[in-house]
Amino acid sequence: MQQDSASYAGQGATILESIGTDLAGGYLRKVEDLVVADVFGDFLDMAEHLLAAGYFVPAAALVCAVLEDALRRLCSRNALMVANTDDLAALNNRLASKKIYSNIVRKQVDFWSAVRNAADHGRFPDVKSEDVHAMHQGVLAFLADRLG
């Protein structure tokens, strides 16, 4: 029986060693990124279907939810502190102030944030279909450029 226990302990140590190697090599991080990309790809696909059906207000909320998560991940990848209470504007300003991306990108993200805020707070006349379509395409490009 002790031999079996020693064998299990050895197998456990081998598994832990393997996990440590994967962590050190960044492989588990890459798997997490793949899962996140798949989930948010689904969200962006849903937004695209909403846009095609004329439901651009909820599409704006979905697209910017993906964008906000992407900004959090970008902050994390660049060792910038992020609080749970940080909103899209705070994340955007932090990234731009640290020169992670340009002021032009910051202004674009500010515009997308304003569109989302109008959608989220019932200012529907301020939400234009063409702005949400452009935001959807812009966020796709942003994700490919910054997190791809």
Which role fits each region the language model picked out?
Residues 13-23, 51, 70, 116, ...:
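A structural signal for well-ordered alpha-helices, especially hydrophobic packing surfaces
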Residues 47-48, 52-75:
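Short, hydrophobic, well-ordered secondary-structure elements
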Residues 8-11, 15, 58-63, 108:
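Residue-level detector of well-ordered alpha-helical segments, enriched
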Residues 1-10, 103-148:
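Charge-enriched, short contiguous segments at helix-coil
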Residues 42-46, 61, 86:
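Charged, terminal alpha-helix-loop-beta segments
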Residues 1-42:
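Internal, Lys/Arg-enriched amphipathic helical interaction segments that engage polyanionic partners
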Residues 75-104:
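Short, charged amphipathic alpha-helical segments flanked by flexible coils
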